[in-house]
């Protein structure tokens, strides 16, 4: 009995609700009765507005928007060329060619043997001759003979044979230079020690006795085969 009363009251409420509405929902939610919707911006503007850019900032071209974040953006010239905004007739190479285009090759520098000046050419000829050209030139200074004579010494030339003979011939100019230096030292010794040079064979000083002893031992004949005087043998300036 209690359950039947509840069911009857529920049915009564539903009937009253249907009578109170009576077609009002159809009139209220019809197509003309929709509230005005807000203007939806394009998708590009929506994506740009989500970035932390200040309001009113210029929106970049579509090419820049299509590049993923962190990717290298091509130069503006390539972007304009891809959008066909470049003036006609102007050739722009592809991006790969721009990246891998080698730098212009500079003209090679002039080498020393290719220089127009004549000084380097003469120097190159002297170097190409080798040590033979240097040995053929006689040493500078007064020419002194093998035993101190004033006769000019014959120039020494390097023989064509190889081995020990070539080495000895190459050392002859150095021996001539040593001979010239020895003569200069002897002259300097005579100027510095005139007393020793003027001492005779019968003096009683220590210098005279030393000269007699050296004369007996024949020390004055042994400096590169050249004869030495008393000044050189006593003072050691001869060799």
From Swiss-Prot:
Entries under SMART domains matching the protein: NAT_PEP
Tissues of expression: Expressed by the venom gland.
PROSITE patterns: NATRIURETIC_PEPTIDE (PS00263)
Propeptide feature: residues: 24-33, 43-49, 62-64, 76-82, 95-97, 109-136, 148-217
Cysteine-cysteine disulfides: 223-239
Segment forming the signal sequence: 1-23
Entry's localization field: Secreted
Residue numbers bearing the Pyrrolidone carboxylic acid modification: 50, 65, 83, 98
Alphabetized Pfam families for the sequence: ANP
Alphabetically ordered keywords of this record: Cleavage on pair of basic residues, Disulfide bond, Hypotensive agent, Metalloenzyme inhibitor, Metalloprotease inhibitor, Protease inhibitor, Pyrrolidone carboxylic acid, Secreted, Signal, Toxin, Vasoactive, Vasodilator
One Gene Ontology term of the molecular function aspect: hormone activity
Keyword set includes Secreted: yes
Annotated stretches, region: Disordered: 132-205
Basic and acidic residues compositional bias, start-end: 173-183
Low complexity bias: start-end ranges: 161-171
GO CC, any one term: extracellular region
PANTHER family: C-TYPE NATRIURETIC PEPTIDE
Family under the similarity heading: In the N-terminal section; belongs to the bradykinin-potentiating peptide family. In the central section; belongs to the bradykinin inhibitor peptide family.
Protein name: Bradykinin-potentiating and C-type natriuretic peptides
Classification of source organism: Eukaryota, Metazoa, Chordata, Craniata, Vertebrata
């Amino acid at each position: 009995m209690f359950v039947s009363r509840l069911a009857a009251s529920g049915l009564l409420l539903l009937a009253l609700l249907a009578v109170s509405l009576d077609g009002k929902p159809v009139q209220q939610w019809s197509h003309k009765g929709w509230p005005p919707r807000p203007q939806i911006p394009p998708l590009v503007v929506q994506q740009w507005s989500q970035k932390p850019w200040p309001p009113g900032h210029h929106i970049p071209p579509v090419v820049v928007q299509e590049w993923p974040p962190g990717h290298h953006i091509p130069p503006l010239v390539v972007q304009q060329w891809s959008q066909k905004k470049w003036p006609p007739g102007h050739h722009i190479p592809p991006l790969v060619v721009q990246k891998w285009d080698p730098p212009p090759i500079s003209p090679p520098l002039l080498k020393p043997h290719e220089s127009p000046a004549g000084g380097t050419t003469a120097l190159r000829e002297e170097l190409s001759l080798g040590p033979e050209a240097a040995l053929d030139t006689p040493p500078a200074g007064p020419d002194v003979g093998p035993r101190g004579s004033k006769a000019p010494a014959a120039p020494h030339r390097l023989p064509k044979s190889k081995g020990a003979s070539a080495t000895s011939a190459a050392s002859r100019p150095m021996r001539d230079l040593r001979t010239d230096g020895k003569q200069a030292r002897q002259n300097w010794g005579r100027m510095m020690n005139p007393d020793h040079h003027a001492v005779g064979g019968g003096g009683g000083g220590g210098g005279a006795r030393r000269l007699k002893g050296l004369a007996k031992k024949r020390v004055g004949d042994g400096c590169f085969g050249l004869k030495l005087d008393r000044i050189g043998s006593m003072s050691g300036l001869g060799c």
